[in-house]
Each structure stands twice: as C-alpha cells, then as structure tokens.
Amino acid sequence: MGLENGIVLQVGGKIDPDAAILKVPGIEKVDWYDNPEPGFTYYDICYWRKYWNIRDILFDNCHAKESNHAYPLTIKQLESIRDDIYYLICDGEDQWDTSRAMWSFEDSVGRLGWDIVRISELIRYLKTDVGYCEAFFYDSY
C-alpha cells in the first residue's frame, strides 16, 4: 500500500505571488517532485502519509490501478475527492477505521479540514483562466 500520496499542482511558469491560492496555509512550492518538466513549477496542495483510507478515496476517484504513479485530476474528480474527505470527517470517530490510517481520528480531523480548504481553493484556481496548469494525484510506495 502506498506510504505517501497527495495532490500537486503543476503550473507552466509561476503563479502570481498575490494569487489567493498561495495565501492558503500549507500550499507551498516544492522542488522534490519526481521527474519535473522543464519550465514548470510545482505546488504541494495536500500530502498524506500512511492514510490508506484517503488513498482509497483518491484511487477510486481517479480510477488508478497501480501505485508509484501520477494521475491527472479533473475538477469533477477534485470535487468528489473533497466531498469524500468531508464525509469521512462527518462520519466521526466511531466510524474511523484505524486499520486504514496510521493516525487517530482526533489527530486527523483538523488536518483533513484544512485539506478540504486547500482542495476547494485549488478548484477555484483551476476554474480561472490562469494559463497552463494541471492537478495530479501522486502515489508512491
């Protein structure tokens, strides 16, 4: 099972430093993304380590079949991922399956709430005319 997965934004060039997406806590430029394409900048939107329940949500929404890959995400898929994470939180601690995440519900709920905010801002950003940009789900094992 994938140990690290997340959502990254690939942008041709750079984002305007005053863009709202860069004001959201936790969205940061990253230099570590595997196989970067020249001329592109990458931003970490969400990162999950040992959250197999979140990985399942991502795999289901992008119809991923193999780990250790990057999968492009549409706005519709991002909306579905965001909603699924919201419902995971709403289900509450009683429904939190500790075998599907290394972290407790109590340790996760605030972080997942911020993930919903970051994904929502990513969706807003992608809906604007910002030039070339694309969101990816990455899975590494």
Where are these regions (language model features)?
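Acidic (Asp/Glu-rich) sequence patches and key acidic residues
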Residues: 1-132, 140-141
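Active-site regions of oxyanion-processing enzymes, predominantly non-cytosolic
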Residues: 135
